């Protein structure tokens, strides 16, 4: 029998906690036998004194086991259960293509996603733009779609990782969100509760990223890769660029449209293609569905070119309550803004740098994102045709097209977009889409 205050004291004094102490405390978070004040105190003690890798693994697995852990064995799946998670960014629509692409190559992708908050968009919000799509289906329907289609993208259910829900809300109110140890446990407990065989982790770097510096992003990526592999899930973390909007757009309905265009081959943004392929190829390799990266990329290009990935996206949408002809007729179902108008830079030149976070906040200002949890969204608004760094812009080439519901909202977003995209006389040096892969062998 342990005492919560003694566990807090031990961590406050900079000592390592045993896995039994961590399990006891997490159980107390779940059963409410540990108070909010005690949870806040432990969070602050961890923030200042950190946790070693054994402690991080113990915290992650204890939080994973605080609720239901999904079991796929009874479904008799004939392929690996694989997934991807992103730390979030602007125009990060990867999940919508990656899930069906991986499923078309023989994987099963039970993706549990979140809603957007602050400047980052949420995968679930994009699906909420699709009429009828159930982001919170019954567990029976979720399992049925995973088995029959190979991919289902839904929201977190109440019985998954309840400890994280309580711990996170207290961290949010007590300034301990930024702890790498606690971020690692929060992200991975939710993913590992899905009982995955393999995970590709997308850790963003740059002006639109969650972590403020490259060094902090790399530290988080290493922590996630080490803890996930230590907990028994094959995981690779990729460090990817978020110094500009990833897709050509940012919003909800506009990103769904770009995902369909990507899957059908109507338009594939080259940067988006590179990061999607990098993550998806890693999932196939970790899941044993490809022998090397070239093999993985060839398989992925095949399911894009032959239409199989687009077909599975359509089946997932209809399987979860959306229209059966969504891929073919998406424009009939997606909401559209009242005002769709380009914005031009005040000078001609090249898109030199971008404050990606500010562009994400411009979408929030339009009504396409949340200032606080629970805010209602307008799924039609956002930005399209966002220029890429290095693009030449002038009086006839816009830096973006704004989708707004009123002249006032358009004017506010126009100012924000012009301020966020910096124009230079020369093009900037090209930066890679993927900075690094952190595999188990690198740890």
From Swiss-Prot:
What this chain does, per the entry, is described as:
The enzymes which catalyze the reversible phosphorolysis of pyrimidine nucleosides are involved in the degradation of these compounds and in their utilization as carbon and energy sources, or in the rescue of pyrimidine bases for nucleotide synthesis.
What's in the GO CC field?
A: cytosol
Taxon lineage = Bacteria, Pseudomonadati, Pseudomonadota, Gammaproteobacteria, Alteromonadales
One matching Pfam family, short form? PYNP_C
The protein's matches in SMART domains, at most eight in alphabetical order, are given as: PYNP_C
Keywords in alphabetical order: Glycosyltransferase, Transferase
Q: Which family does it belong to?
A: Belongs to the thymidine/pyrimidine-nucleoside phosphorylase family.
Q: Which organism is it from?
A: Shewanella baltica (strain OS185)
The record ties this protein, via HAMAP family, to: Thymid_phosp
Which molecular-function annotations from GO does this UniProt entry contain? 1,4-alpha-oligoglucan phosphorylase activity; thymidine phosphorylase activity
Tell whether Iron is among the UniProt keywords: no
This chain belongs to which protein, by name? Thymidine phosphorylase
Q: Which domain of life is it from?
A: Bacteria
Keyword Transferase among UniProt keywords: yes
């Amino acid at each position: 029998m342990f005492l919560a205050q003694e566990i807090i004291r031990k961590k406050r004094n900079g000592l390592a906690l045993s896995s039994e102490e961590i399990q006891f405390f997490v159980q107390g978070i779940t059963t409410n036998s540990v108070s909010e004040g005690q949870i806040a105190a432990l969070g602050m003690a961890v923030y200042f004194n950190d946790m070693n890798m054994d402690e991080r693994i113990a915290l992650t697995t204890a939080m994973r086991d605080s609720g239901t852990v999904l079991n796929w064995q009874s479904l008799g799946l004939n392929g690996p259960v694989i997934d991807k998670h992103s730390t979030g960014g602007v125009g990060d629509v990867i999940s919508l293509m990656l899930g069906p692409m991986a499923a078309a190559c023989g994987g099963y992708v039970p993706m549990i996603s979140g809603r957007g908050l602050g400047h980052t968009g949420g995968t679930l919000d994009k699906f909420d733009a699709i009429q009828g799509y159930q982001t919170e289906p019954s567990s029976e329907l979720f399992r049925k779609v995973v088995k029959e289609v190979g991919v289902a993208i839904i929201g977190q259910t109440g019985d998954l990782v309840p400890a994280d829900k309580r711990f996170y809300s207290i961290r949010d109110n007590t300034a301990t969100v930024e702890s790498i140890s606690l971020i690692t446990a929060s992200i991975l407990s939710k993913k590992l509760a899905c009982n995955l065989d393999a995970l590709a982790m997308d850790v963003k770097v740059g002006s639109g990223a969650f972590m403020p510096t490259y060094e902090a992003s790399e530290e988080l990526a290493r922590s996630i890769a080490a803890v996930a592999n230590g907990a028994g899930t094959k995981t690779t973390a990729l460090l990817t660029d978020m110094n500009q909007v990833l897709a050509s757009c940012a919003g909800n309905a506009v990103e769904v449209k770009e995902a369909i265009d990507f899957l059908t081959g109507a338009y594939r943004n080259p940067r988006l293609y590179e990061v999607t392929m990098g993550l998806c190829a890693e999932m196939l390799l970790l899941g044993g569905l490809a022998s090397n990266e070239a093999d993985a990329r060839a398989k992925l290009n095949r399911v894009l070119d032959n239409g199989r990935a687009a077909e599975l996206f359509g089946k997932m949408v209809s399987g979860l309550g959306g229209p059966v002809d969504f891929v073919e007729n998406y424009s009939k179902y997606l909401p559209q803004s009242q005002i769709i108008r380009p914005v031009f830079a005040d000078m001609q030149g090249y898109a030199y740098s971008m404050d990606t976070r500010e562009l994400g906040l411009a979408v929030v200002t339009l009504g396409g994102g949340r200032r606080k949890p629970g805010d209602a969204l307008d799924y039609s608004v956002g930005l399209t045709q966002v220029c890429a760094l290095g693009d030449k812009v002038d009086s006839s080439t816009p830096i973006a097209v704004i989708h707004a519901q009123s002249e006032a909202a358009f004017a506010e977003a126009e100012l924000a977009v012009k301020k966020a995209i910096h124009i230079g006389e020369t093009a900037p040096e090209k930066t890679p889409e993927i900075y690094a892969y952190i595999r188990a062998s690198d740890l």
